[in-house]
Structures are given as structure tokens and as C-alpha cells.
């Protein structure tokens, strides 16, 4: 995907400057991320190596081209909602998830060097379900989402 500045786009298309991104809750952001991943469920995405072994500063700066996070960052709606880049730390902040949750979606130790987008989508959707339904029932519901 080729990224263009607003000025470049204005040369070839009508661009509205008054667009206001609808405020999305963290759970709505997670569901959108899962939907984006499900658009091409067989797409092979890259994982991040050893997220659990890196100190926080290194882990937060980790990124990879064609990762589940980069799919989210390519989405103009999520960018308009405040997603700043495709790093691990930004995904953690923007989606308001734990290191454990992101580890379960992204880490090499679970999937090797690549993960199918559909599998990542199920993991992201399970996180969203747990966020909506905290406690025991949330864990039960998220187990069936996988």
C-alpha cells in the first residue's frame, strides 16, 4: 500500500478536511482489527520474535512489515481514531490490551515466523469478548470464539 499525504491526494481527488473520526471504544477498535484481519483470512502475516524476553523499551518499539499490527495501521479509520504507528507499544496503548494479550496474537513462540490472518483475527476477537465480559463468563465466551 502506498501512503500519500493529504496534499498529494487533494491533487487527484476531493478530500474533506472536516472529517471527524467517530470515537471508537477500545473494544470497538479490537473488533474492527479482527474484521480487517478476516478480510483475507489465509494471508500469511509475520510475527514478532521473543516479545516476552525483551525489556519494555525494546518490546514497545518492536514492529514488522506485514504483521497483524501493520494491517490495523493501514486502516484509515483506526489511524483517524488515533493509531500512530505499527509498533507493539502503540498497539498496546491504542487497543488498551495487556502484554499477555498481544503476546498471544503476535509472538513467534506460538506460531513460528508467520501466522494466518484468520487465526490472528480469532485471537483479537477473543480479547474483545473478554474485554466486554470480564470475569469467568468472559473467559468462557472467549474460549468459544477461538
Question: For each predicted feature, which ranges?
Answer:
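Catalytic phosphate/metal-binding cores of nucleic-acid and nucleotide-processing enzymes, i.e., regions
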Residues: 2-145
